[in-house]
Amino acid sequence: MSRRVDYRYDECGLGNVILKDLTVCIDDDGDEVVTIPNVNLLHQTLLVQVAGKESGLLPKEIRFLRTEMGLTQAQLGQLVGRDGQSVGRWERGEMPIEQAHEMILRMAAGEHADQVVTSMMELATRTMPAASERPYLIDASDPDHYRALEAVAA
């Protein structure tokens, strides 16, 4: 037996990802069994959504983009012209990422996903901090075609 649920996908490290209409199975004891099919496609969908968000990146989002691109802190630091310790400070929220470095990270993430996130001019306007954190909503009804949904303002 199975049913569809809206599942909070904390396993990715972002803490604000909702998989809409995810199919979960019910085992013989009546407990829900959650499996995330096609997780690589899901993470690529999230990577594009995070890289293209309309406000500044949060520390956990910087870490998510870096790890999804398969980079160490030192490698990301080299990519943006900083050291690995600076990247660690950004990811721990000890210091904010500079606008130019955030733009490079976003462009690299889009390139990694074989997508253009947006233009440099547009990215420059998206690096300002947000007043509140919006969830990332993913349509999980068809795991072969995950797609981002627009978050409703709180």
What are these regions (language model features)?
Residues T72, D83-S86:
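Short coil turns linking two alpha-helices in DNA-binding domains
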Residues G81, R92-E94:
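Residue-level detection of the helix-turn-helix DNA-binding "recognition helix"
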Residues L71-L79:
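Short, solvent-exposed secondary-structure capping/transition elements
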Residues E94-R106:
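Short, basic-rich loop-to-helix N-cap that marks the start of a DNA-contacting helix
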Residues S55-L71:
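Short, amphipathic alpha-helical "recognition" segments used to contact nucleic acids or chromatin
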Residues E68, A108-H112:
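Generic structural signal for hydrophobic core residues of well-folded globular domains
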Residues I62, L76-G77, V87-W90:
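Conserved hydrophobic/aromatic packing and binding residues within compact polymer-binding modules
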Residues M1-G56, E111-A154:
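N-terminal flexible/basic segments that precede or flank functional cores
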